[in-house]
C-alpha cells in the first residue's frame, strides 16, 4: 500500500483568512470531487457556482497508477490547472471542500478535515481504495499551503445500515456501508421538496448510475441498506466488476491472476474496461446504437443487474416504496430509464434526475456551517459499527 505517496505535512494548516460573524461575508469555496473516471472541480462564492469543470480520465490513463493514492499528484495538477485557467489565486480561497471516503465510517453530515482523518483515509482503514478519498487529501494538501478551512460532506462510507444489512455467511465478516452518499441524499432531499414532503417521511430507492453504480434503500431519512459498489457488489459498471460468485473469483485466481489484479477490477479495470478496453460509456453506447451484438448484450446486462438490485431494495423496504430515483451521468441514456421502468415500474414511480448535485450539496452544507446554521462533526477515529454486543462481550 503506497500510503507514503499522500505527501502529508506535519505543519498545522494556516488560520482562516476571513473574519467570523460577518453576515455579509462572501465565502470563496473550492469544491473537489474526484470520481472513478473524472475529477470535478467547482468554485463557489456563497451559493453561486462561479465555475465548474469535469475533467475525464480514460481507463488506460488511470491504470498507470497502482492505487488511488498514486493518483494524488495527477489530480493535484488538475486542480491547479483549473484555478490557473480561471485566474483564481488559491491563496484567496477561504474554504477547501473535498469529497471523501475510505477512513473509518462516520455519521452523515459535514465533517472537519484533520490530520487523523487524512491519515486514516490514505490507509483505507474503513473500506476499499476509491478515488473519492483524494478529495479529503487534496483539500488538506492545499489548505496547509494556502490557509483557510477544510471540510468533507457525506463521504462514501457514511454508515446508517440496519443490523440485518451487516452480517455475512462468514463469522466476523461484515458488509460495509460504501455508496454514493453525497449525491443520493442530495437528490432524495430535492425529490422530497418537489413532493412537498420531508426526506425523513419517505421510503425511497435511490440509484446513482455513472462510472460507479450503487443502489440504496432510504427509510425515513436513513440509508438502511445499499450495494457496496467499490467492493464488488451490485451491477457491473464502466469500471467495476460488480457481483460475481466467489467460486468464479477463486477459479480466476487459480488461473494465475493476482489479488492485485482483482482489487484493480473492483473500481478501475472491471466492467466496460474489461470487456471493451475503455471506461468511456459514450463509445460503448455508440456501439450499442450501431447494433454491435457484444455491446448490446453487455450494456443491457448492466441495466438488468441494476433492476435486480432495485428489486432487492424494494424487499428491504417491505414493498412500501414512495419512489425510485435514478441519478448520475449515465442517466443521459434513455434506454436505461426505459429498462428500469419496464422491470421495476410496478414497484413505485420512477423519476430521473440526470447528472448529479454533489458540488452544490457540498457547498450548501458547508455554507450552512460557516453561517452558524449547522454544526460540523469531528472525525472520531472509530467506526460507527465495530461488531454486535455478543461479539464485544466474548
Where do the PLM segments sit?
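Short beta-strand-loop/turn "lid" adjacent to the catalytic site in phosphate-handling enzymes
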Residues: 83-131, 149, 157-168
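Adenine-nucleotide phosphate-binding core of ATP-dependent small-molecule kinases
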Residues: 264-318
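Short glycine-rich, Thr/Ser-proximal phosphate-binding strand/loop in the N-terminal lobe
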Residues: 29-70
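Structural signal for terminal/edge beta-strands and the immediately following C-terminal loop/tail
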Residues: 354-394
